[in-house]
């Protein structure tokens, strides 16, 4: 009697799509793990016994940073602690439940700091003027004070490679400075050390990773400020370059890591008479008094 033939179930379009999604997610996670791990090693970002505070805004970058650091923590050669912190600035319409619900599901220690900096910014900044400078200084001042009070040794921010390049061009175009965001920034008084674990990661990879991981993204509705508009112009320029000239952004980023002071024109970095390098000005997180009374909030320039 012939054996009964059983037909194997055909793959449905949905299951094939899910398989491709899973493969893409695994590939992206490996790439981001590698890039974050390399940045941590290259710049000595995290050391044994560190307490790392991941600053979460609810955007794709900070979600991805926390996710990758939690992943790396499991297999890291050194033991370090991770906590997540969000500053609720009391922006109208900010969904207060989203981050706590997500962080509860992740099982990580977290803190939500409630400070109404939104009202301060609206009160102090004239209509039509950029809010970014004051808003970021107030935000960082609060976060840095919190870090010191809670024994945090490293403050992790979610800036990625594209942010570093955009900041370089913003400073060149509008500030007359050859200046970007460093992967690690130490304060002069030793209070704070800021790290940027995503320094090697591309924004488009982070955006796709966040989409595949289905992070509960919270949009920022506070500003349509001039600084953000200027940054958007540069971002669009980079996107055009990336399409028309693949590899250009990678080469530009390598230039940030390969500076030759003798071929620039800054006498603070190079003694052109003696033909030797100088120490230059040390850039760091500096505590500064606000120009106006903003209450008991320290303003830190970064």
From Swiss-Prot:
GO terms for molecular function: 4 iron, 4 sulfur cluster binding; ATP binding; magnesium ion binding; sulfurtransferase activity; tRNA binding. InterPro entries: Rossmann-like_a/b/a_fold, TilS/TtcA_N, tRNA_Cyd_32_2_STrfase, tRNA_thiolation_TtcA_Ctu1. GO terms for biological process: tRNA thio-modification. Its EC number is 2.8.1.-. It is found in: Cytoplasm. It comes from the Bacteria. It is an enzyme of class 2 (transferase). Its cofactor is Mg(2+); [4Fe-4S] cluster. A motif (PP-loop motif) lies at residues 57-62. Pathway: tRNA modification. It catalyses: cytidine(32) in tRNA + S-sulfanyl-L-cysteinyl-[cysteine desulfurase] + AH2 + ATP = 2-thiocytidine(32) in tRNA + L-cysteinyl-[cysteine desulfurase] + A + AMP + diphosphate + H(+). [4Fe-4S] cluster binds at residues 132, 135, 223. It holds the Pfam family ATP_bind_3. Binds 1 [4Fe-4S] cluster per subunit. The cluster is chelated by three Cys residues, the fourth Fe has a free coordination site that may bind a sulfur atom transferred from the persulfide of IscS. The keyword Nucleotidyltransferase does not apply. Keywords: 4Fe-4S, ATP-binding, Cytoplasm, Iron, Iron-sulfur, Magnesium, Metal-binding, Nucleotide-binding, RNA-binding, Transferase, tRNA processing, tRNA-binding. The thiolation reaction likely consists of two steps: a first activation step by ATP to form an adenylated intermediate of the target base of tRNA, and a second nucleophilic substitution step of the sulfur (S) atom supplied by the hydrosulfide attached to the Fe-S cluster. Catalyzes the ATP-dependent 2-thiolation of cytidine in position 32 of tRNA, to form 2-thiocytidine (s(2)C32). The sulfur atoms are provided by the cysteine/cysteine desulfurase (IscS) system. Homodimer. Belongs to the TtcA family. This is tRNA-cytidine(32) 2-sulfurtransferase. It comes from Marinobacter nauticus (strain ATCC 700491 / DSM 11845 / VT8) (Marinobacter aquaeolei). The gene is ttcA.
